[in-house]
Amino acid sequence: NDIDWIADYSDLHYVLSKTRFFNELDFITEDSWKGRIELKKDKEYHCYSYVGNRQPDIFPESGCKWHDLFHELFKPSDRLEQKLQECGFPEKSYIAVHIRFVNALENFEKVSCCDNAIDTEKQKDDLIARCQKGILRIKEQNKDCDILVFSDSKRFLESIKHMPVKTLPTNNIGHISFGTNADMTMKTFIDLYMISRAKKVYRIDAPELYAWSGFAVTAAKIGSIEFLTENV
């Protein structure tokens, strides 16, 4: 990266007269931030954000440069870059599809902001079938390009092995917010950067899914690629 962005605690001000604390979750609707944020050069802003895909809307003067600013701050480590190359998909040679199930199929998070566990196997099979049909529609629209599917559900990824699409290895899948290890963290970054290097990315949405996930949106901004939604 071009900038040493890591700050020490001694670099930060905590005097209220010099700082302003900003929680992006206070700004949920599209226009609720308007008129409430006036940036001042003599203030230090401490921004706490989980839904980072909304940041360009809240700070519009940086929105058009999000991609450039990201790459000034971050670049893949040598180890991550090696893992990305080992995936075997040249950049812009595939279409990415992302599906975030959270607890809908495996129910592997005991605590989650998305309580979407499905009760019956029949309901789970129905959701899987609808997502598969959504992927086939995407494939039909992009016949001459590989479709690379990403998901937090090993069960779903195993269910599409018979389809004319591709996946990465399904080991080390997890959510880093709820317990993690080095391999799981690496898998998360592999998925993020592989999506960012696609020609474009589709996010599959459904009432049962964690459809407001910002993962694919963030990857699309990193790669400055088109982001589309497929409802199932």
What are these regions (language model features)?
Residues 186-232:
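A donor-sugar binding/catalytic signature common to diverse glycosyltransferases
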Residues 94-95, 146, 200:
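Structural motif
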Residues 1, 146-154, 205-206, 230-232:
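Acidic carboxylate-rich catalytic motifs and surrounding loops in phosphoryl-/glycosyl-chemistry enzymes
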